[in-house]
Every structure is written in C-alpha cells, then in structure tokens.
Regions:
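Hydrophobic/aromatic-rich core segments of domains that either
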Residues: 163-246
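Short N-terminal helix-initiation segments at or just after the protein's N-terminus
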Residues: 11-21, 140-150, 198
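Short beta-strand segments enriched in hydrophobic/aromatic residues
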Residues: 13, 78, 204, 215, ...
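Linear, non-domain "peripheral" regions
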Residues: 1-111
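Short capping/connector residues at structural and topological boundaries
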Residues: 22, 68, 101-102, 144, ...
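Secondary-structure boundary elements
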Residues: 78-82, 87-159, 167, 232, ...
Length: 267
C-alpha cells in the first residue's frame, strides 16, 4: 500500500517569542516494511538533517529572530509492506529495557502484567496484555497531559494513544522484554483526517513486533513509522522550547490516504 501524508503543525503566541528551538522527528526512513518514495519538510528556514542516538532522522529548527507564529509542514509518499509482521535490526534491543519517568512500572502495573502474561514471554502473551490494557484504560481525549506518566494514567483508567503505549512499555519491561515507543501515522478507512499516532514495539525472537493498544492491532499493516525511543519525549514528531511568547495555541492537521500505484508497461 502506498500512503500519502500531509502533516501541518501551527503555533500561535500571544506575545513575541524572542527565540525558539524545535526538535523535529517528522521524516520517515526506509526499513524492511516501509520505503520512502518522496518526502519533504516545509520550514521557516533550511535545516540540515541529522541522526539521533535511536537512528531517527532529526531536524533542529532554531529561530533567533522575534516571531509570533511558526508553521511546520511535512508531506510525502511511503510504500508500506502490509504482509510483514516483524522487523529485524542490527542495533541492540538491550537499551529498551530501561525505564523512564514516563514509563516506570509501579506495583499496580507490575501486577497487571503478571496477571495477564503469567509466566509467558511470547507474542501471544503480549497480545493478551494489549487487549487487557485497551479494556482497562478507556480512550479519553483530555483525560491526561503530555507529561502524565504510565502509572498515573493507568490509575485513572483513561488516556490516549500516548498513555496506552507508555503503560504497555512499563508492563513489557517489567517482564524483562525490551520495548520501545513508536510515533507515526495510521491510515484508517473510517476517515482520512487523523492526528499523529503512537504505538509500541517489543523485541521477541530477534525481531520487533508491533502492538497498537489503542486500536487493538498486532500487525502494522497500515502504520507508517516516523521515530522510536524509550518514551514520548524521544520520539514525538515535534518538541520545542522558547523564550517569551506568553500563552501558546497549537493546531495540528494530519491527512493520511492511500494512493494508487501506477505501473508503466513497456511496449
């Protein structure tokens, strides 16, 4: 499947911002299950790409002139291998056993993981865990903040895809299974207009397997990956800091849709 993506993020500030810096992980890269056909960023000024410690493509946008708005755009086309269930990588999975403030498992999460996985440490066990988390934590926009940790979201029994993913990571790591946060996009036939998405990957049998708690999907057939990390802070598409500006309004618009692949026949 070939997906076309358009993602625009706009920031408006009530006062002039003296300076700002934005960390952008908005560029996908080729892997076993996705191939980038075309991609470009639309930014206020040219920025050189670099690679972060997790292998993500990173752009650092620095604006040192006064401004009251920023518009960040990304668009392109990517082919997705809908049949591939897992991805192999040469990088060690060991770092993804480490917990962070957002993914630390408390006694409740450790007990939940043990209850639903018992002594099993296979894909079936993690699929059961994924379904159990989805039933326990009701998808509720606005129930949590961007810095809400897994334990707090789990205790509140509500959250969004970020919280579902953090809770899954906390549980998997408590079982000794390397797991990582994934940011990207998901195409759904229900609507082409979606927000950016988040899901988890766990290291099993020397490969990374996907677990989308929010949508109860264990096969990434319509997922497009942007970045990975230990948690949201490592992999979120846009994260920044600024001096001045006062109150901020942020609006994100995402469009994801399939695109016909036209084959040219030679005569």
């Amino acid at each position: 499947m070939r997906l076309s993506i358009s993602h625009e993020t706009t920031y408006h500030y009530e006062d002039q911002v003296r300076a700002s810096i934005q960390y952008l992980r908005l560029t996908p890269h080729d892997s076993e299950r996705q191939r980038v056909i075309s991609w470009q960023l639309d930014l206020p000024r040219p920025v050189r790409a670099q690679v972060d410690p997790f292998g993500n493509i990173l752009h650092v946008l620095t604006l040192d002139e006064p401004h009251d708005a920023i518009i960040i755009g990304a668009r392109g086309q990517v082919d997705i291998d809908e049949l591939r269930e897992a991805e192999h990588e040469s990088q060690s999975a060991f770092p993804f056993l480490r917990s962070t403030r957002l993914t630390e498992a408390d006694e409740a999460l450790r007990g939940f993981a043990g209850q639903h996985c018992h002594q099993r440490r296979d894909r079936t066990a993690l699929i059961d865990l994924m379904h159990a988390l989805n039933q326990t934590m009701v998808y509720t926009p606005g129930a949590t903040e961007v810095d809400t940790c897994a334990a707090k979201a789990f205790a509140g029994r509500a959250g969004v895809c970020q919280d579902h993913t953090h809770a899954f990571l906390a549980c998997a790591r408590s079982l000794g299974i390397p797991a990582r946060y994934v940011s990207g996009y998901l195409y759904s036939e229900d609507t082409a207009h979606l927000a950016s998405h988040a899901w988890a990957e766990a290291w099993l049998d020397d490969a990374w397997y996907s677990f989308d708690v929010t949508n109860q999907l264990a096969r990434p057939e319509r997922h497009l990956k942007l970045a990975v990390g230990l948690d949201y802070l490592d992999a979120c598409p846009v994260r920044g800091m600024r001096r001045g500006g006062g109150h901020e309004q942020m609006h994100a618009k995402v469009f994801v849709a399939p695109t016909p692949v036209i084959s040219v026949q030679q005569q």
